[in-house]
Curated annotation (Swiss-Prot):
HAMAP family in the record: Idi
Protein name: Isopentenyl-diphosphate Delta-isomerase
Superkingdom as given in the UniProt entry: Bacteria
Its biological purpose: Catalyzes the 1,3-allylic rearrangement of the homoallylic substrate isopentenyl (IPP) to its highly electrophilic allylic isomer, dimethylallyl diphosphate (DMAPP).
EC number of this enzyme: 5.3.3.2
Family under the similarity heading: Belongs to the IPP isomerase type 1 family.
Record has Zinc as a keyword: no
Listed PANTHER family: ISOPENTENYL-DIPHOSPHATE DELTA-ISOMERASE
Length: 185
């Protein structure tokens, strides 16, 4: 059986939806602006979950990144998409009530080593979870709970080892937190 076609929501420059495109073909050298999300998970000790993208990923394979990210389907809320991707990517649950919208206006454009462009309007969420992780090997090569300040230092020292969206999001999350020493940035 053929898996269902996954589509992304295309956006105008002002963020208004203007259509959809097949996810398998939309990421190219001229990727249009589309809707996505990022989610940063924390444990009860205030550590942040970072994941290393599986080597089979089309863009930025093998780099360390945020806990998980994805694209909502047309008509799917960001919160519903986050719950879906938490299960698909990490084998865990994220309670919609535990989600906090941390960076509502985050947007970026980046080009990977193969020339493929990411061009996303990408609200950033955080959540604290207490559930076990069972990551999908198709999505995640490795994962680690990290001290937020140590991660921020690592990203600053070796940005090439991390996804471009993490290198942009993490300092913004840290700044928005009021420089909290632990817990959710």
């Amino acid at each position: 059986m053929t898996p269902p076609r996954e589509e992304v929501v295309l956006l105008a420059e002002d963020g208004a939806p203007i259509g959809t495109a097949d996810k398998a073909t939309v990421h190219s050298e001229s990727t249009p602006l589309h809707l996505a999300f990022s989610c940063h998970l924390f444990d009860g000790d205030g550590r942040i979950l970072v994941t290393r993208r599986a080597l089979g990923k089309a863009t930025w394979p093998g780099v360390w990144t945020n806990s998980f990210c994805g694209h909502p389907a047309l008509g799917e809320s960001l919160e519903e998409a986050i719950a879906r991707r938490a299960h698909e990517e990490l084998g865990t649950s994220v309670d919609a009530l535990a989600l906090a919208l941390a960076l509502p206006d985050f947007r970026y454009r980046a080009v990977d080593a193969t020339g493929v462009v990411e061009h996303e309007m990408c609200p950033v969420y955080t959540a604290t979870i207490a559930w076990e992780l069972r990551p999908s090997a198709d999505e995640v090569a490795e994962w680690e709970w990290a001290d937020p300040r140590a991660l921020l230092s690592s990203v600053a020292a070796t940005p090439w080892a991390f996804s471009p969206w993490l290198t942009l999001q993490l300092p913004a999350l840290y700044a928005a937190s009021g420089d909290q020493p632990s817990g959710q940035l």
